[in-house]
């Protein structure tokens, strides 16, 4: 039997979250490849609303898939404000799960998430961050680690989405997370290289 693909691994987690009725939204490269440059990714970041009463149900459902996740790791993630992992030991695939905090940005991300097709082969859908929120979080991640991949992903989203983006929303949250300078540089570069008319920001 052929081993599962990363998309199949991700799909099994998405289907489980939906079967449990948990509110979630997917960000990271998984979402940016939908809005920007389509490419294979083995990186999925899922933000979920996980009441304490649902933690054990989630653990049991994920373990039934044959994946590793433990209640202690979820509790630690809650206390330390860090993600926990869901791991398929057979393939080595991993998903990073972020517990949604009661912050204005996290709440905005959930409210603005949208159901999108993430696999054109199967037409599978999931709730993804909006493209604007993908940009904001990639700005945050860039400031944390200075990885150029985040800037490339943002650039691809700008090129593909163009004037469909809410630039005022991005500017507001870029300021809130301390990324205004980086955002303005990316926007200026986009304007220089794009053949489209400059967005009204």
Where are these regions (language model features)?
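Compositionally biased terminal segments of proteins
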Residues: 1-201
């Amino acid at each position: 039997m052929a081993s599962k693909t990363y998309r199949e691994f991700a799909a099994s987690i998405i289907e489980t979250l939906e079967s449990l009725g948990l509110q979630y939204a997917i960000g990271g490269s998984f979402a940016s490849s939908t809005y920007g440059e389509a490419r294979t990714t083995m990186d999925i970041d899922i933000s979920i609303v996980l009441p304490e009463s649902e933690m054990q149900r989630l653990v049991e459902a994920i373990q039934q898939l044959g994946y590793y996740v433990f209640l202690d790791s979820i509790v630690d993630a809650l206390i330390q404000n860090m993600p926990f992992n869901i791991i398929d030991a057979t393939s080595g695939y991993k998903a990073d799960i972020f517990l949604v905090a009661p912050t204005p940005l996290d709440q905005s991300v959930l409210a603005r998430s949208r159901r999108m097709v993430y696999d054109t082969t199967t037409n599978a859908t999931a709730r993804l961050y909006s493209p604007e929120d993908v940009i904001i979080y990639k700005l945050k991640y860039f400031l944390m680690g200075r990885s150029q991949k985040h800037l490339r992903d943002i650039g691809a989203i700008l090129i593909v989405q163009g004037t469909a983006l809410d630039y005022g929303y991005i500017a507001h949250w870029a300021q809130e997370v301390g990324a205004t300078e980086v955002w303005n540089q990316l926007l200026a570069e986009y304007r220089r290289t794009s053949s489209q008319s400059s967005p009204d920001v």
